[in-house]
Amino acid sequence: MPTIQQLVRKGRESFADKSKSPALNSCPQRRGVCVRVYTTTPRKPNSAMRKVARVRLTNSKEVNAYIPGEGHNLQEHSIVLVRGGRVKDLPGVRYHIVRGTLDTAGVNGRTQRRSKYGAKRPKPGQAPAAKGKK
């Protein structure tokens, strides 16, 4: 326990917050190249095949990034834009790939929350796009 005089001289040391996306180096997004595109299974109560890519960023760090939305066109050597944001049920996945930029296509047939998935606005009067696999 410090004395009042010690606190006057030195003060309390405040801890700096730890970054939740350290590989981005305080940038909002980073460009990278897909090293491996694969599927993985989520943690315990959930069950699915989640699409994930191992990405080498321009600062030469490698991260696991989640590919959001239904269906994607990514493969090895695709250039992608990576943003922060973890996936709660995938351990070690702390980043998201931005859809609709660089080599990543937007989600086809998406009508709601389109900006999050890089989907263009459908033409007025046009029938909704057919669903993919059932």
Swiss-Prot record:
Record keyword Repeat present: no
CDD domains recorded: Ribosomal_S12
Gene Ontology molecular function, alphabetical: rRNA binding; structural constituent of ribosome; tRNA binding
GO biological process, one term: translation
Sequence ranges of Basic residues compositional bias: 111-123
PTM annotation (3-methylthioaspartic acid): residues: 89
Disordered, as annotated region: 1-27, 103-134
Comp. bias (Basic and acidic residues): 10-20
Keyword Transcription annotated: no
Keywords assigned: Methylation, Ribonucleoprotein, Ribosomal protein, RNA-binding, rRNA-binding, tRNA-binding
InterPro entries: NA-bd_OB-fold (IPR012340), Ribosomal_uS12 (IPR006032), Ribosomal_uS12_bac (IPR005679)
Low complexity composition-biased segments: 124-134
Any one Gene Ontology cellular component term annotated for this protein: small ribosomal subunit
Domain of life: Bacteria
Known role: With S4 and S5 plays an important role in translational accuracy. Interacts with and stabilizes bases of the 16S rRNA that are involved in tRNA selection in the A site and with the mRNA backbone. Located at the interface of the 30S and 50S subunits, it traverses the body of the 30S subunit contacting proteins on the other side and probably holding the rRNA structure together. The combined cluster of proteins S8, S12 and S17 appears to hold together the shoulder and platform of the 30S subunit.
Annotated family: Belongs to the universal ribosomal protein uS12 family.
Assembly description: Part of the 30S ribosomal subunit. Contacts proteins S8 and S17. May interact with IF1 in the 30S initiation complex.
UniProt name for this protein: Small ribosomal subunit protein uS12
Organism per entry: Porphyromonas gingivalis (strain ATCC 33277 / DSM 20709 / CIP 103683 / JCM 12257 / NCTC 11834 / 2561)
